Amino acid sequence: VTPHFASPGDDYLRRIGELAYAVSSLEWTLLGDLHRLSATLPATLTVSELAGATTGRIARQLRQGAALATAPEVATYLIAGGDALAEVAELRNAVLHARPTTIDGEQRLYRWRSQPAEAYAISDDWFDDALARVAKLARQVNAARPSFDAYPA
C-alpha cells in the first residue's frame, strides 16, 4: 500500500516506535508493581485507578502516593518512578505532538510550541539522546525498586 503522505522512511519510523515503547515499558514496570506493593500504598494507587491515565497523570499520582506510603523504600521508589515518568512523558510527547517537515531534503518531525517556547527538529541525534535518557532513568527506577523478596508478587 502506498502511503498518501510523505514518509520519513522505516528507520526513522522505527525510532519513533522505539521511544514510545521504551516509555510504555517504564510505565508498566511501575504500574505492574502496584499490586505487590499494595499493603504499603494508599487505596487509590492501583492499576485499576490508573488504567487509561496519561503518563503525566501517573507520574503525579505516584509522587502524591509516596507521601502516604507506609514503607520508606516504597516511597523512595514511587518518587523515583514519578520523577522518571514525568521526564520521559515530555520526551515522548515531544515526538507525538511534533509536526512533519522537510529538513535537508528528508522528512522529519519538528517540535514547535509556544508555552513553553521551544522549537527543534526531532533528529537522529535527538533520538539517540532521548533513548539514552530513558534508559538511564529506567536504570535509576530499577535501582530504587523494592525487592521481590521483601514484596513478593
Summary of predicted features, one role per range:
Residues 1-65, 83-90, 94-105, 133-153:
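Amphipathic alpha-helical interface elements
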Residues 89-129:
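A mid-sequence interfacial segment
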